[in-house]
Amino acid sequence: KPIPFDPEQAKALLAEAGWKDLDGDGILENDKGDKFKFEYTYASSGEIAERLARFVKDSYEKAGIMVTTRPVDWSRYQELLKLRDFDAITMGWGANAPESDPRQIFHSESVKEGGDNFVQWKSAEADRLIEKGRRTMDEAERMVVWRELEAVIADEQPYTFVRVAPWLRFVKRDFGNVQTYRTGLEPQEFFKTSATPSPAAN
């Protein structure tokens, strides 16, 4: 279940943690006078990235947190990712159809080189559920396990999920067994229903 967008509740929780607007400028400070601020780095690859950057900035500032946006080109963005030279970033993950194996992104073993647990999140409960789900052959039972894993991820927030992009796919009529899933299509399930026409004789 997504965490609701509630700037006032965010301010209340931050106040409990010692962050308050002490000088009336709309930005939270701690008892040392340090402003609550961070830099948001993103790849300036188009309109969606720019709109998302504005959304992040506006949303946080409603809770009294100052955000400086830092657009960079794709090659520089990859360098910064590798160096981990950023305060906050946006990343995009694509899902396989009909379901994705969460081990590569969310298991603690995937923190190691070669894995994609880029945020280095470790959770014994998540590991247990991932291993259980991968051993569960019955699809309905496996979906129950994945829902439990989703609840752990939603609670611990290794990522804050912002959007799901719509998708549009075209498939020729002479392909059969085309199944649509919430995450897309799986071309390996397709089969051709008619022979490919031979080229016309000269």
Language-model features: where?
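Short helix-initiation/N-cap motifs at beta->coil->alpha
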Residues: T69-E79
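Acidic, glycine-anchored loop motifs typical of Ca2+
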Residues: D23-L28
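Short, well-ordered beta-strand elements
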Residues: K35-S45, V67-R70, D87
